[in-house]
Design a protein with these regions (language model features):
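Short coil-to-helix segment of the ABC ATPase nucleotide-binding domain corresponding to the Q-loop/switch region
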Residues: 116-129
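ABC ATPase NBD coupling module
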Residues: 26-29, 87-104, 139-140, 213
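Catalytic Walker B motif of ABC-type/P-loop ATPase nucleotide-binding domains
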Residues: 187-190
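Conserved ABC transporter NBD signature motif
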Residues: 71-86
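Conserved catalytic motifs of ABC-family nucleotide-binding domains
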Residues: 183
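Conserved ABC ATPase signature
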Residues: 162-166, 170-172
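Helix-to-loop junction immediately C-terminal to a conserved catalytic motif
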Residues: 63
Length: 248
């Protein structure tokens, strides 16, 4: 038997020493002061924090929607790595692909296009990122995937409806189906139940828990301790840093 130590798996997604300051004219508003975290394949990670603590900013940087600061000439404001590769070093085209294919986004507000049907909203981001041929075959595959998700989420009878005809919980289900239609490696969820009543919010969390059991990795930011209890692991964001302890 070998005495060699077991290899440590590369995290699926990790942030190391991420720093972010917003500038409003001459005013600087520091938000993140060296935040670090990692999420493994198939893990549900909750990041707890009060309103204004920088949770959304951290999530946006993880997903490539925002960038960490540049600090000095030879240093930067931290690094985000996906499967060991720094996303800050990706070309614009590769970064677009990362956001479109590897990451699914769910927000507190649903951001559905009012003129499109439920199924059209669910397939839109996946179709936008597709260029390979044969186009018709790929388009059909994406549509079938979206319909399967919507049916699993209890919206099979709503496929042709417009967002204005849906309840808040139904709209969030469409948003989740849209986020998962491209089979992303990880779902980034920003207060996904924050705009819903407790019962409907619980139903949304049940839905996410089922997708997690199917192997989906989730990073969810929230201020609700009850939601954090659903996760495999919980971290706390305070004073711009991530802590493993709930106590300051």
């Amino acid at each position: 038997m070998s005495d060699a130590p077991a290899a440590v798996a590369t995290p699926l997604l990790e942030a190391e020493d991420v720093r972010k300051t917003y500038r409003l004219g001459a005013i600087e508003v520091p938000v993140l002061h060296g935040a670090s975290l990692s999420v493994r394949e198939g893990e549900w990670l909750a990041v707890m924090g009060s309103s204004g603590s920088g949770k959304s900013t951290l999530l946006h940087i993880l997903g490539g929607l925002d960038r960490a600061d540049r600090v000095g000439r030879n240093a930067d404001g931290g690094e985000v790595r996906f499967r060991g590769r720094a996303i800050e070093r990706l070309s614009n085209r590769a970064l677009d692909r990362y956001r479109n294919r590897e990451i699914g986004f769910v927000f507190q507000f649903y951001h559905l296009l009012p003129e499109l049907s439920v199924v059209e909203n669910a397939v839109l981001p996946a179709l936008v990122g597709q260029v390979p041929l044969p186009w018709r075959s790929r388009r059909h595959e994406i549509r079938e995937r979206a319909i399967d998700l919507l049916e699993r989420f209890g919206l099979g009878h709503r496929l042709k409806h417009r967002p204005r005809e849906l309840s808040g919980g139904e709209r969030q289900r469409v948003a989740i189906a849209r986020a998962l239609a491209n089979r992303p490696a990880v779902l980034l969820a920003d207060e996904p139940t924050g705009n819903l009543d407790r019962k409907t919010g619980g139903e949304i969390l049940d839905l996410l828990a089922e997708e997690h059991r199917r192997g989906l990795s989730i990073v969810m930011v929230t201020h609700d301790a009850g939601i954090g209890e659903r996760a495999d692991r919980t971290l706390w964001l305070r004073d711009g840093r991530v802590d493993e302890s709930p106590d300051s």
